[in-house]
Amino acid sequence: MLTYHKTTEEEKYRITAWKYDGDYAVYNSTPYAQQKQTGFGFANPKNHFYSFYDGADLVRFINLYEEETEVFFGIGAAPEHCGKGYGQQMTRIACSICRSLFPGKPMYLEVRTWNRRAVRCYEKAGFRIVGEPIRQTTSAGDGIFYHMVKDA
């Protein structure tokens, strides 16, 4: 059973130190100390971050960012806990948090098209791909992404 709370300062340092291998290395983050200097990512006060635990293990985090008509949903997993079955449960909890904070607003996310494991997880949680894949540049580099939406 996952538990969660608002992400603490200490957790922001821990999460941004997570390192991924292979194709997933695009998800390696800028260190939190650097984010604090620029007001980016975990240092942006408009972001709503939550940390998820399985017992004493920090396994995931989410970010909810309210926009005018919808809410951006970001998700991250501790590298050693990827593919362990937490994704759907955590996504359902994230949807519940979103409905509580931002009632009536749909959620959306953007996921790299090659990340089939994540796409399947989001589809099982009720997200659907909208439109054609889009090429964009993010803080993690260039990529081709699906835009996925879950109605409010």
Can you say where each PLM-predicted feature lies in the sequence?
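Amphipathic, positively biased hydrophobic alpha-helical segments used for protein targeting
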Residues: 67, 85, 96-98, 109, ...
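Acetyl-CoA-dependent GNAT
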Residues: 6-13, 17-82, 91, 97, ...
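Extreme N-terminal starter segment of soluble prokaryotic enzymes
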Residues: 1-3
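Conserved glycine-rich acetyl-CoA-binding loop
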Residues: 74-92, 113-120, 124
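C-terminal "cap" of GNAT-fold acetyltransferases
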Residues: 104-108, 112-119, 124-128, 132-152
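Generic secondary-structure boundary signal with a strong preference for alpha-helix termini
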Residues: 72, 86-88, 97, 130, ...
